[in-house]
A protein has these predicted regions:
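Flavin (FAD/FMN)-binding glycine-rich loop and adjacent Rossmann-like elements that form
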Residues: 1-191
């Protein structure tokens, strides 16, 4: 969840910490089979669930649907004509806070998350026109070809010698530790 303002002195943090975590995703590795590989229509499929995942005239929040279908498909491009689908914007993310759940409850959540990914695959194939892509059978040693565990975008901060916070970005020269003089690994997360 989110740290409170006091923990790291970040003015954008909430006053009280909470246990709200980011969505989980059952990532799909899609492979270009070179021919139509449409899956059967999943139960509870409703295309409107995904209209805003890419730019679409059907998206009621068109100002938020900034990515074209091609850009979404290229976001997770892999070698050998494969694509990783891990799309947080009205895609295959699934919210559930597992922290307080027992193993049986978590299994139900994981099943629902996989079902959402399958609905998104159906949308990709039928609404976006990428019917030559389907789940690769070469990636994971599982019956359903999904990863063994879901992906989370979130992790707790590491409490090290120095803990990096937003303040080191906003006011780098006003901090106790002169991190602006050190190297920092920065990733590009274009979503």
């Amino acid at each position: 969840g989110m740290d409170n303002k006091i923990m790291y002195g970040e003015d954008i943090a909430p006053d009280e910490k909470n246990d709200i975590i980011q969505d989980l995703t059952y990532v799909m590795i899609l492979k270009n089979f070179g021919k139509s590989m449409k899956i059967e229509k999943p139960i509870n499929y409703d295309p409107s669930e995904f209209y805003c995942s890419t730019s679409s005239i059907n998206c009621p929040e068109s100002d938020k649907a900034l990515w074209s279908p091609d850009q979404m498909m290229n976001y997770g491009k892999l070698p050998n004509d494969k694509i990783m689908i891990n799309w947080p914007i009205y895609g295959n993310d699934y919210y559930s806070n597992l922290l307080e759940m027992n193993e049986d409850q978590r299994k139900v959540v994981f099943k629902k998350a996989k079902e959402k990914s399958m609905r998104y695959l159906y949308y990709i194939q039928n609404e976006l026109g990428f019917d030559n892509y389907s789940i690769s059978d070469e990636e994971y040693d599982t019956k359903d070809n999904f990863p063994l565990i879901p992906y989370y975008r979130e992790a707790r901060r590491i409490s090290g010698i120095t803990t990096f916070s937003l303040n080191y970005i906003k006011k780098p020269y006003d901090q106790v530790n002169p991190l602006y003089r050190t190297g920092i690994l920065v990733g590009d997360y274009p979503v």
